[in-house]
Amino acid sequence: MQQTTIQRSITFSGIGVHSGQCLNVTLHPASENTGIVFEVITGDTRHTLIPSPSAVIATKLATTIGNKNITISTVEHLLASIRGLEIDNIRICVEGAEIPIMDGSAKIFTNELLQAGIKYLPATKKILQVIKPVEFIKGEKRIRALPYNGFKLDYTINYIHPIIGHQRLVLDVTPTTFLSIANARTYGFLKDVEQMLKNGLAQGGSLENAIVLDSTKVINPEGLRYPDEFVRHKALDFIGDMAMMHLPLQGYFEIYCSGHQHNNQFLHKLQDENALALVTLEGEKTQNLYQNITPLYNDVLALL
């Protein structure tokens, strides 16, 4: 199976959900074995940042990566699109310190990546395969990884809220099945908004880029895109957080009520317990996974 990149550069512009600033991000094709690379230009200096579990420096309400020179927050939705579409190599050039929130989902990122086109490269695809069971538990939060020939999620959330309640999603993630969660938006509670604003967070948050719930209902006029949009979005976040590994993961992941912090701690545990093996997919025949995806995704968008 061959590695992939995008066929042409694309630019996104939008508001940072926490900073409230207008931001630009440009994605560029990258050569084989580049992986996912962030670039931030400050003045005359170009800083490079490669995602990794140790590059995560904050997980409050979003995943933030950084080093001594730069920080980039809210990276998870864009990374979910890249990993969900199985794009191996890409350069992400960021103007600012945050990825724009767009509509609160991965819908726009996914759509534009598909419109740009996916290009196969000569090099063989490499993955990190789970080779033994690993379990991370912190309070009620739980993530368990098992060996599996693919990338499969079994995600459960449980809220004491009449609209959310108990939701479960089982998904064998491929570029096609990823479309079923790409449009699921981030969510929050009206009771928490005032405190977030006092703490300098959610400065760009609105009903245009998040589902907001009061004690009994969704207050967005258009309602939900799916009855289980909440667990779909949590699965989206998980995929984005797993992209902190330098290569795609392969395994079966059972997740209960996790969040960005726990996802990152889980990745550290996978590394600490030597539960991952580097696998080159030499024997896999490359098929055009993207041939029918764009028309299919357009059909999905038409239903929203």
Curated annotation (Swiss-Prot):
One of its GO terms (molecular function) is UDP-3-O-acyl-N-acetylglucosamine deacetylase activity. Its EC number is 3.5.1.108. Zn(2+) binds at residues 77, 233, 237. Keywords: Hydrolase, Lipid A biosynthesis, Lipid biosynthesis, Lipid metabolism, Metal-binding, Zinc. One of its GO terms (cellular component) is membrane. The keyword Repressor does not apply. Pfam families: LpxC (PF03331). One of its GO terms (biological process) is lipid A biosynthetic process. Its cofactor is Zn(2+). Pathway: Glycolipid biosynthesis; lipid IV(A) biosynthesis; lipid IV(A) from (3R)-3-hydroxytetradecanoyl-[acyl-carrier-protein] and UDP-N-acetyl-alpha-D-glucosamine: step 2/6. It catalyses: a UDP-3-O-[(3R)-3-hydroxyacyl]-N-acetyl-alpha-D-glucosamine + H2O = a UDP-3-O-[(3R)-3-hydroxyacyl]-alpha-D-glucosamine + acetate. The keyword Transcription does not apply. Belongs to the LpxC family. Catalyzes the hydrolysis of UDP-3-O-myristoyl-N-acetylglucosamine to form UDP-3-O-myristoylglucosamine and acetate, the committed step in lipid A biosynthesis. This is UDP-3-O-acyl-N-acetylglucosamine deacetylase. It comes from Lawsonia intracellularis (strain PHE/MN1-00). The gene is lpxC.
